[in-house]
Amino acid sequence: MEPDTATEAATVAVSDARATVVVVEDEQPGPSTFKEEGAAAAATEGTTATEKGEKKEKITSPFQLKLAAKASKSEKEMDPEYEEKMVNMPLKADRAKRFEFLLKQTELFAHFIQPSAQKSPTSPLNMKLARPRVKKDDKQSLISVGDYRHRRTEQEEDEELLSESRKTSNVCVRFEVSPSYVKGGPLRDYQIRGLNWLISLYENGVNGILADEMGLGKTLQTIALLGYLKHYRNIPGPHMVLVPKSTLHNWMNEFKRWVPSLRVICFVGDKDVRAAFIRDEMMPGEWDVCVTSYEMVIKEKSVFKKFHWRYLVIDEAHRIKNEKSKLSEIVREFKSTNRLLLTGTPLQNNLHELWALLNFLLPDVFNSADDFDSWFDTKNCLGDQKLVERLHAVLKPFLLRRIKTDVEKSLPPKKEIKIYLGLSKMQREWYTKILMKDIDVLNSSGKMDKMRLLNILMQLRKCCNHPYLFDGAEPGPPYTTDEHIVGNSGKMVALDKLLARIKEQGSRVLIFSQMTRLLDILEDYCMWRGYEYSRLDGQTPHEEREEAIDAFNAPNSSKFIFMLSTRAGGLGINLASADVVILYDSDWNPQVDLQAMDRAHRIGQKKPVRVFRLITDNTVEERIVERAEIKLRLDSIVIQQGRLIDQQSNKLAKEEMLQMIRHGATHVFACKESELTDEDIVTILERGEKKTAEMNERMQKMGESSLRNFRMDLEQSLYKFEGEDYREKQKLGTVEWIEPPKRERKANYAVDAYFREALRVSEPKIPKAPRPPKQPNVQDFQFFPPRLFELLEKEILYYRKTIGYKVPRNPEIPNPAIAQREEQKKIDGAEPLTPQETEEKDKLLTQGFTNWTKRDFNQFIKANEKYGRDDIDNIAREVEGKSPEEVMEYSAVFWERCNELQDIEKIMAQIERGEARIQRRISIKKALDAKIARYKAPFHQLRIQYGTSKGKNYTEEEDRFLICMLHKMGFDRENVYEELRQCVRNAPQFRFDWFIKSRTAMEFQRRCNTLISLIEKENMEIEERERAEKKKRATKTPMVKFSAFS
């Protein structure tokens, strides 16, 4: 049996002078109320609380309920619903206590607590600020004990007094210093206040949202709360902590560091690992806290639904803001006594998303979304100060938010510098191409497709980051890693200079980008420069994430750079060992960038944190950053007052996107050269610091109304007068026009060339030299005897002499005058063919392959490429209309006299490429045969030596199936990968493996090529070992034994 709760609290208070046990009666608990009493007074009050609370504990303790159920067996038999009633008694008591607490906070909760059947959604604009009227029969369940402002009848007052006299006092433990069970170090003052706030919520049966700014220790405060439940309330668990996959390792480490007395398990792994873990770890129940990820909860919801969780904690609570999402529906099905949401971003959701969070926390209070939406209408709420106060009053009991500047005075400062950079020549060319492709959109004034505008924005942002993000932009193949990676991007030029300076200063860097393909480029850059780095993005497996974070945070780590994707690496990861953050590109949502900065600027940081944001000047990026700054400033004004941002203000309008795209377009069109300069990094930083200060000063001066009315196109505001936009009227007649760049022409100062261009008269070509009219047309691929070509040439020269042909000068060849004289000399000295030569010519004309046409020759060359020069049978089948004997005869002459052909180099290169492919196929087939031959049952036994090249997506079972089926079907078959794709889809073991079933034939080909390379490498290693062993055995001298005969 569990010890009595109040007794436990008093006992701990006596033994631990750190805690103060306070009897709270009709007092509003909260983080701002603290009693300064000593341990002795705490023990005395705790004892008193124990005596007062005995009756209540005897009624509400589930263990005592079980004893009562055993003692009154006959009563249980008489009433079949007796047990259910007894179990629900403490839940009803908690609900009543919760309602009482909420009504003491503000009378507005009476509107939500009254039965929904007796009320309909009513706008608050039409209601008085008072308790809603209800039927007399319902008053018993709705009267708030803490509400003394309204007149009562005598009978009601008597009933209230009787009810008060029967109530017991609440026992609430509040800490003034760090609790003794927290072992990793003392809690800070504001963390102790946060812990007390969480305890007060628990004691009053209310769930809440801990929304401290990122880096203030929400994890630690939550762990301390669970430790309080175990050590002061004797409630060790079970508790569930639901976190993003990237933070699992961090949560486990924090539990071990701060409250090692809590027994914590981490639920993660593949299907087989999970099944064993459930059987061996979870079901025995030898644990207090289960830490798991969203994905695990969705996959194993049936297991988690078997437990009644004492506390259900969800980190990064914005994941359940949509009540219709799969995760949100599943966690609502879990049975839990208390719930806690953690989020590092303020409540900037629309009203319905806010209701979804509150409905998860208190479903019995916030059970109607329509009622909530009508009670706090967004438009009226933003305009009516009274309704703003009401909303603030509703959120106050559930929400605790502190920011670093208010509570953490010892944290080093954070300074952000925006570095403005120009475009390189290649970037400017691609930027112009993108704009020119959609110039009709830029110059349109009618309807625009929003998705098309978003796509243009995305392409322009890629160009600002690095032109190599576009296929075909990088020079190659072969692809090289050298200076061009830096020189073709303005941001990379600045980053290269900045990293060199940071390295000299002994600092370490976090680089964030939204584009994982850009991280690939940065990886190549780091390898080229010799910088040691770690990488984390959305595709990084959980184990590799842990290894990368641990390696970077290790003492005296040699890792200089940690590159992360903004979305995957911006949540819940502690990288305070770095003190420089570089935002390579900016997110649409400024809160995401703040989360990224807080990976370094958090508790534990010893150095001032410098944040460098790279921005390409006179491009769409400049407008994106400006819009984010305005949004962040507006949020800071509104949200910190407990208000909500208007949903429409967060949406990016089509007109706003169009103005972003248009911004800087004229500037880009006007200039074609690179804007990059040779400035040193100090000058660049000074200029960026100055521009950042100017922007911050401008934002500080702008009030809420100015920020709301701010538009990207400043000129447009000139056309607004008395609430009417005269620019829109003007657009009906005219359209804002961006002039595309003019077509460039090279200057040409040759007068003749100028007039030829003006009159469009092309320069006359040199006429072909005449040939005898009846001379036969012979081709080099027909392989006539060489003597025939000599006789034909002699005949041609004499014909030209007889017609008086003069050789023209050809300016395209070197030394045209000399060549002209020599050719004319041959013509002038030409002689006719003698009768013997004429007879010889006719005879030689029969000795070539006269029946072979150009088409036959091309078929012969392609067949040699396809089958190799030795496979005459297949080559003969490819040449249409020729017998195998004819092809064999031609092939023999071809390979003997191929050097006589004009394009022999090109032809031989074509054939040799084909033969190389044939040899490659043969070697692959041998490698597969050797690999398969090592196993009796390769479909089950085959193992692949991955080394460090294991992919992130394919499992070993999938790879084994691909290799075995490829060998079975024949590697060199036509359309083999399409057939392999069908086999995968029909395989029963993959019927639920949607990843591999959704791969294309091309993706299977790429994967098989990777696996074949690994197999070939493995075969080579085996062959080398065998050769070494043979050589070792051969070099051993045989031992000769001599025997003596007597």
From Swiss-Prot:
Residues 494-645 form the Helicase C-terminal domain. The modification Phosphotyrosine is found at residue 946. Transmembrane segments: none annotated. One of its GO terms (cellular component) is CERF complex. A motif (DEAH box) lies at residues 315-318. Residues 1003-1037 form a coiled coil. The modification Phosphoserine is found at residues 120, 123. It catalyses: ATP + H2O = ADP + phosphate + H(+). Gene3D superfamilies: Homeodomain-like (1.10.10.60), iswi atpase (1.20.5.1190), ISWI, HAND domain (1.10.1040.30), P-loop containing nucleotide triphosphate hydrolases (3.40.50.300), Tandem AAA-ATPase domain (3.40.50.10810). It is an enzyme of class 3 (hydrolase). Its EC number is 3.6.4.-. Residues 820-829 have a biased composition (Basic and acidic residues). Keywords: Activator, Chromatin regulator, Coiled coil, DNA-binding, Hydrolase, Isopeptide bond, Nucleus, Phosphoprotein, Repeat, Transcription, Transcription regulation, Ubl conjugation. Residues 27-61, 819-840, 1025-1046 are annotated as: Disordered. The keyword Transcription regulation applies. One of its GO terms (molecular function) is helicase activity. InterPro entries: Helicase_ATP-bd (IPR014001), Helicase_C-like (IPR001650), Homeodomain-like_sf (IPR009057), ISWI_HAND-dom (IPR015194), ISWI_HAND-dom_sf (IPR036306), P-loop_NTPase (IPR027417), SANT/Myb (IPR001005), SANT_dom (IPR017884). One of its GO terms (biological process) is neural tube closure. ATP binds at residues 212-219. Predominantly expressed in cortex, cerebellum, ovaries, testes, uterus and placenta. Its main location: nucleus. May form homodimers. Component of the ACF-1 ISWI chromatin remodeling complex at least composed of SMARCA1 and BAZ1A, which regulates the spacing of histone octamers on the DNA template to facilitate access to DNA. Within the complex interacts with BAZ1A; the interaction is direct. Component of the WICH-1 ISWI chromatin remodeling complex at least composed of SMARCA1 and BAZ1B/WSTF. Within the complex interacts with BAZ1B/WSTF. Component of the NoRC-1 ISWI chromatin remodeling complex at least composed of SMARCA1 and BAZ2A/TIP5. Within the complex interacts with BAZ2A/TIP5. ATPase that possesses intrinsic ATP-dependent chromatin-remodeling activity. ATPase activity is substrate-dependent, and is increased when nucleosomes are the substrate, but is also catalytically active when DNA alone is the substrate. Catalytic subunit of ISWI chromatin-remodeling complexes, which form ordered nucleosome arrays on chromatin and facilitate access to DNA during DNA-templated processes such as DNA replication, transcription, and repair. Belongs to the SNF2/RAD54 helicase family. ISWI subfamily. PANTHER family: CHROMODOMAIN-HELICASE-DNA-BINDING PROTEIN 3-RELATED-RELATED, SWI_SNF RELATED, MATRIX ASSOCIATED, ACTIN DEPENDENT REGULATOR OF CHROMATIN, SUBFAMILY A, MEMBER 1. This is SWI/SNF-related matrix-associated actin-dependent regulator of chromatin subfamily A member 1. It comes from Mus musculus. The lineage of its organism: Eukaryota, Metazoa, Chordata, Craniata, Vertebrata.
